[in-house]
Amino acid sequence: MSHWATFKQTATNLWVTLRHDILALAVFLNGLLIFKTIYGMSVNLLDIFHIKAFSELDLSLLANAPLFMLGVFLVLNSIGLLFRAKLAWAISIILLLIALIYTLHFYPWLKFSIGFCIFTLVFLLILRKDFSHSSAAAGTIFAFISFTTLLFYSTYGALYLSEGFNPRIESLMTAFYFSIETMSTVGYGDIVPVSESARLFTISVIISGITVFATSMTSIFGPLIRGGFNKLVKGNNHTMHRKDHFIVCGHSILAINTILQLNQRGQNVTVISNLPEDDIKQLEQRLGDNADVIPGDSNDSSVLKKAGIDRCRAILALSDNDADNAFVVLSAKDMSSDVKTVLAVSDSKNLNKIKMVHPDIILSPQLFGSEILARVLNGEEINNDMLVSMLLNSGHGIFSDNDELETKADSKESAQK
């Protein structure tokens, strides 16, 4: 039985640590499956880059080119998932939905590709709460995908509307040159749209080019600029020497009040929160100037190591999600077996499951509050020692029988005094 419990705990720890990497690998494999599908076609998509005039264009090449680009985008986007970027998660959902619809319509016999795509979509939706980070890498991927799509559209659009320009666009290189010239809004005037359709097309390229450029620059350089501006205004961020401190995981009301109370008593506290970047700023303002907040997943071993788990006094899992609290304790004990753990339980139904992770202290504020209310309404006497005993035992049986007897004995001695 002990071997099974050890295996179960190890498997749980591996799942918590590697689930995001597994998901990124699944998205990457979806891209490879698309490449495998293209490789088996009789049409060579690379021939599309050797076209010199529109008259040489085989429409079958253009029909399959989006599938090739879809595979490229999925492979690139899997990198963003490794950083748990919210933007990468959203783009992956969109790309996989497009791939699923495309495959169902044109290649319905590819059962494995369809099934694996559906599995990855479900996997992404299940882990949606884990992807809340803002990442420069994800912004770079988004910028590359947007720029590549716009370049493809503008180049072959100009080649398709070649007769609407003066002079006429007759080669792929000329169309590519016109696309870059228009997207950058340089406009040398050597190629001028003369037909109505060509002018409307040029307007769409100009607007799209400005939008993609502005969005890309914001996604990539925005976080860097904001960080530099904050340092300029506020000075260097307070860096706490993380030793003999408390680690609080979560941003619940209980967690925030606990942090404030510990700070009032001069204790050093490091907070781990998976809130979005803007909400992290609000949390830091609420906790004060000396707040030491680490953005990230409290189940991630690298985040716990950064928080100084091997040098802390205790780690407190105080989020509103009982499962997340249990995973925090499992991850903490896996990294440092001697660390003291405190776990908050919101739902009494989860108490028996919570006990399996063996935290040092289990607190159940809801059960504690209901017990106090029942005693008050029943007219029972309540003193400070009884309140402490009830709070520490709100998790039902977190101490051994000897510990409970010692607590009761101490309460009697205090009452006699």
Swiss-Prot record:
Entry GO MF terms: identical protein binding; potassium channel activity
PROSITE patterns in UniProt: RCK_N
Domain (RCK N-terminal): residue spans on this chain: 243-363
Keywords carried by this UniProt record: Cell inner membrane, Cell membrane, Ion channel, Ion transport, Membrane, Transmembrane, Transmembrane helix, Transport
Highest rank taxon of the organism: Bacteria
Cytoplasmic face of the membrane: 1-21, 84-86, 128-140, 221-417
Effect recorded for residue 414 to L: In strain: ECOR 46
Outcome recorded upon mutating residue 411 to N: In strain: ECOR 46
Transmembrane segments: 22-41, 64-83, 87-104, 111-127, 141-160, 200-220
UniProt entry tagged with the keyword Zinc: no
Gene3D superfamilies registered for this protein in UniProt: 1.10.287.70, NAD(P)-binding Rossmann-like Domain
Record flagged with keyword Lipid metabolism: no
Topology term for the membrane: Multi-pass membrane protein
SUPFAM superfamilies registered for this protein in UniProt: NAD(P)-binding Rossmann-fold domains, Voltage-gated potassium channels
A GO BP entry: potassium ion transport
Function: K(+)-specific ion channel. May play a role in the defense against osmotic shock.
Family: Belongs to the potassium channel family.
Subunit-structure text: Dimer.
Protein name, UniProt field: Voltage-gated potassium channel Kch
Gene assigned in the entry: kch
